[in-house]
């Protein structure tokens, strides 16, 4: 089964106009623009990074829309990765010059990992079993951010 944003029937790419992120009104465009990543969690939930519309949407495995997180202030939704814990509690999302940390189930934005002067345009994200983040950048190779635990 194919589906578009909000679980809508997708339309041909030629008719999906890219709308400036500054013009968004809630809930946003009814179709995806550039789907830059799709990830399926262990519980079967599907997460879609719609880069040009600067949002992440979650769906059931049969295409029913569940939630959306849009961050229109900066470049958002370049890539997606799950935390390695059994529940995959966190969703990591490429965000401007860092990585947004999001509660996976609620899609609540928690914060951004953005070490000073280290990250460029993070384009692909992956985690390992220890919680380390690996970030491939468009202009500066790859970096590993070592997991040292959660802080307040």
Give the residues covered by each predicted segment.
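Conserved beta-propeller blade signature
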Residues: 45-48, 89-93, 132-135
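A detector of repeated loop/turn-to-beta-strand junctions in beta-rich toroidal repeat architectures
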Residues: 32, 53, 96-98
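Beta-rich, blade/repeat-based domains predominating
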Residues: 12-43, 72-88, 117-130
């Amino acid at each position: 089964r194919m589906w578009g944003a909000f679980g809508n029937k997708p339309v041909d790419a030629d008719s999906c106009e890219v709308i400036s992120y500054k013009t968004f009104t809630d809930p946003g465009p009814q179709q995806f623009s550039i789907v830059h990543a799709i990830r399926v969690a262990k519980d079967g939930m599907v997460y879609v990074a719609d880069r040009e519309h600067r949002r992440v949407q979650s769906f059931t495995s049969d295409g029913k829309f569940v939630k959306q997180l849009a961050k229109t202030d900066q470049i958002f939704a370049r890539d997606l990765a799950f935390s390695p814990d059994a529940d995959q509690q966190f969703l990591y999302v490429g965000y401007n010059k860092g990585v947004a940390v999001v509660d996976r189930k609620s899609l609540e934005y928690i914060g951004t990992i953005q070490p000073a002067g280290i990250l460029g345009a993070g384009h692909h994200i992956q985690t390992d079993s220890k919680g380390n983040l690996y970030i491939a950048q468009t202009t500066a190779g790859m970096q590993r951010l070592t997991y040292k635990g959660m802080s307040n």
